[in-house]
Design a protein with these regions (language model features):
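Active-site-proximal loop/turn and secondary-structure-junction residues that shape catalytic pockets
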Residues: 96, 267, 277, 316-318, ...
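Short glycine/acidic-rich loop motifs that flank beta-strands on beta-rich extracellular proteins
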Residues: 87, 101, 121-122, 142, ...
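Single conserved hydrophobic/aromatic residue that forms the stacking wall/gate
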Residues: 1-11, 15-17
Length: 486
């Protein structure tokens, strides 16, 4: 175990160069540097962002904390000015700030004071439909409430809350609500599908769901701009989308009620997520807390995640698109985190086609997650997952598996008859190709779980078996089932 030093955003060291330029704030190490030499793999130190000693307040740009005034322009104007000045801090003071999408730019630290609540508008027309990635595939979605692309030296820090107003976006399943909650939801508007099982915020959202059936939330067909606009409510954005950014810090803030995934760094480098809280309703569809996708060098430490789907999830793209991107998620330290409700505490996949390697997970607690440690993929993905090191994990009240490897996630992969039973389909084993996922060299030790539906479940592919899984000192008590190897 390693002791995590607290982040010293408040304990700043300033320097001044010989030309008397404005002082620069250096964010000190938030983790004992010795850990890098103690890892079971070689990993360079995660670089932290730096910011000039310059700050502005969004009030000076006309922002009003009345919960009624739309502050989109004021907040983005403040960000643009700080960026134009060479960088610094944009301060969001206490108050209720209604806004549309916020675009973070290089060298900007968006700082929220205590009791600052940033509420993203329920007017979905404020979020333009853009080309982006969702669940590992290139598609079109609405712009995220918080986004950055190709930015460097960016941060969201402080003590405030960002509320994505996700209840206005998400479909909701009847079996996840009480009878009273369901009646109230249906009475609020929207539509219910033909089976009476799922509520959607609009007819357009329902159409999007129909066109996306069996295609992982991505609509099929030749669609016009008017088609996309009609389905806008289906094109739920992630709450925070950072794409191809370098030196990123999220610290201290709370992110809640996301339209789909909450935090989604994609193809980023040098990422630190420290002392962050994610709070999504347990019924939130696709309400993952953190999806770290195709990123290199990351610290995920001292966080609390409460999610409607996966808690801490490592990804790298889906199927052929992920393999062509060829960007593994690698060199990641995950320490001292707590995951409450969620479909998995620590998860790899199922979108892992670009590969996953050099992941270190230590000192984490999972309380009531559907599954504890979850590895998932299927035929068609391809990708290599290896060199995963997990230790000192404590879990309680896990309804399903404490540890699972499931290479049949999401149904049957290519090469199988969709009309056959999954196991009967194995009479003809497909050949190993680039579409075959590989899981190997995974080391798990010192895991304690009290209460589980099943202790361990391995469900591998006959053509590419799960290899070299090392388990040491795994204690699962009060489990309904023991170990199942398939």
């Amino acid at each position: 175990a390693y002791e995590i030093a607290s982040c010293l955003v408040g304990l700043e060291m300033c320097i001044r160069d010989s030309n008397n330029c404005p002082s620069t704030t250096i964010v000190e190490d938030i983790i004992d540097p010795a850990i890098y030499t103690s890892l079971p793999f070689k990993m360079d130190k995660v670089e932290q962002p730096t910011f000039p000693d310059y700050s502005v307040n969004i009030i000076d740009f006309g922002a009003k904390p009345d919960g009624i005034t739309l502050n989109t322009k004021a907040i983005n104007d403040a960000i643009q000015q700080v960026n134009a000045k060479g960088g610094g801090k944009v301060i969001i003071p206490e108050g209720l700030w209604l806004t549309g999408p916020i675009e973070l730019l290089s060298n900007v630290n968006l700082y929220t004071e205590k009791n600052a609540l940033v509420l993203f508008s329920a007017d979905h027309s404020l979020y333009p439909i853009i080309n982006t990635s969702f669940e590992g595939l290139e598609t079109r979605r609405c712009q995220s409430p918080i986004s950055a692309r190709n930015a460097e030296n960016i941060a969201i820090t402080g003590h405030g809350v960002f509320d994505g107003n996700g209840d206005t976006w998400r479909p909701t399943k009847k079996d996840k609500l009480t009878e009273g909650q369901w009646k109230k939801l249906v009475a609020s508007g929207g539509v219910v599908d033909a089976d009476g099982r799922i509520w959607y915020p609009s007819e357009g959202a329902l159409k999007g769901a129909i066109l996306s059936k069996d295609n992982f939330n991505v609509p099929r067909g030749e669609l016009t701009d008017s088609d996309w606009d009609y389905m806008r409510d289906w094109l739920r954005p992630v709450l925070l989308s950072f794409i191809k950014c370098n030196k990123v810090l999220l610290e201290g803030a709370t992110f809640k009620n996301s339209p789909s995934w909450c935090l989604h760094p994609l193809s980023c480098e040098n990422i630190t997520i420290n002392k962050v809280t994610v709070s999504n309703p347990w019924y939130s569809q696709n309400g993952d807390a953190l999806d770290l996708e195709s990123c290199n060098k990351a610290l995920i430490i001292n966080n609390s995640f409460d999610a409607g789907d996966d808690g801490i999830c490592i990804k790298s793209g889906k199927d052929e698109q992920g393999r062509k991107r060829g960007e593994p998620c690698q060199n990641v330290i995950v320490m001292n985190n707590t995951v409450l409700h969620g479909h998995g505490g620590f998860v790899v996949g199922s979108e892992m086609s670009g590969g996953v390697n050099n992941i270190y997970v230590d000192n984490c607690t999972f309380m009531g997650t559907d599954v504890g440690l979850r590895f998932k993929s299927n035929r068609g993905r391809g990708g290599l997952v290896e060199n995963i090191y997990i230790s000192n994990i404590n879990m309680i009240n896990i309804p399903n598996e404490a540890l699972i490897f499931n290479l049949y996630y999401g149904g049957k992969g290519r090469g199988e008859d969709p009309n056959q039973d999954e196991k009967k389909a194995e009479t003809t084993i497909p050949p190993v190709t680039e579409e075959t996922p590989i899981f190997r060299n995974i080391f798990i030790k010192d895991v304690t779980c009290n209460g589980a539906g099943r202790a361990v479940f391995f469900n591998g592919l006959p053509e590419m078996r799960i290899k070299n899984i090392n388990m040491e000192n795994i204690i699962v008590s009060n489990a309904k089932e023991g170990v199942v190897l398939s």
